[in-house]
Amino acid sequence: AYGAIGAGIPPYEIKKVVTVCKAYSSAVGAGAFVSEIFGDEAQELRVRGGDGGEFGATTGRPRRMGWFDCVASKYGCRLQGTTDVAFTVVDVLGYLDEIPVCTGYEIDGKVTTEFPVTNQLEKAKPVLEVLPGWKCDIRGIKKYEDLPENCRKYIEFVEKQIGFPITMISN
């Protein structure tokens, strides 16, 4: 809202808010990262990610890697007033036989799909649902219907979990 005001546009004139979500998670710095992965699994995703991999642009430091987090993404979309989601770097996941997705958090033995306060977030363990991969290169595919079935199922699963329409996909 304040960005619009600074640009001379009243907030009520904004009709569409596009939130960009990567098909997997990465983070820089410390803090809770519920879906974080480690070791060879993280390194493989890190190296394949983005244009030059998931490394800091200035420092070259490796980013922390994780599976797509539906809980955090749903919360972020809600806070931003999202109307549409652009789902990016979907092609990066094409090497995987199976793709875990974080659909909830287990905190003190209870599962929630709502984003918790910080002290609860720090105790959260991921609840993962595993989807089949598509095992092929999808770069260059322009039409949604031309994507492999399992890729479309992954996108549709995430869309249902976060509760916001994925209207754009980049590969």
Which residues fall in each region the model found?
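Non-transmembrane, aqueous-exposed alpha-helical and coiled segments at domain scale
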Residues: 1-171
